[in-house]
């Protein structure tokens, strides 16, 4: 049996940081950083969030700083 391909055209993900003209990703802005964290507390990859490589590095560093400062958890509670 031949397998059929499914799906159509995928919508391109938009870089949230670039779209909203955010110049500096602040580690104290927890609401912004929570957009880039999974329910388990892990940093979401670029292919999921759609951020550019440059902005992904900014987000990752800000999340790591916020974790060390105690603003974000390292792992989510069940």
Curated annotation (Swiss-Prot):
Pfam families (UniProt xref): Ribosomal_S18
Keywords noted in UniProt: Ribonucleoprotein, Ribosomal protein, RNA-binding, rRNA-binding
Any one GO BP annotation for this protein: translation
Disulfide bonds: none
A Gene Ontology term for the protein's cellular component: cytosolic small ribosomal subunit
A Gene Ontology molecular function term of the record: structural constituent of ribosome
Record InterPro entries: Ribosomal_bS18 (IPR001648), Ribosomal_bS18_CS (IPR018275), Ribosomal_bS18_sf (IPR036870)
Quaternary context: Part of the 30S ribosomal subunit. Forms a tight heterodimer with protein bS6.
Function: Binds as a heterodimer with protein bS6 to the central domain of the 16S rRNA, where it helps stabilize the platform of the 30S subunit.
UniProt similarity note: Belongs to the bacterial ribosomal protein bS18 family.
Name assigned to this protein: Small ribosomal subunit protein bS18
Taxonomic lineage from the root: Bacteria, Bacillati, Bacillota, Bacilli, Lactobacillales
């Amino acid at each position: 049996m031949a397998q059929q391909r499914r799906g159509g055209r995928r919508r391109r993900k938009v870089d949230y940081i670039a779209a909203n003209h955010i110049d500096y990703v602040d580690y104290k802005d927890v609401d912004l950083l929570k957009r880039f964290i999974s329910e388990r507390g892990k940093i979401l990859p670029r292919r999921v969030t759609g951020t550019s490589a440059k902005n992904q590095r900014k987000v990752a560093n800000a999340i790591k700083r916020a974790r060390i400062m105690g603003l974000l958890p390292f792992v989510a509670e069940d």
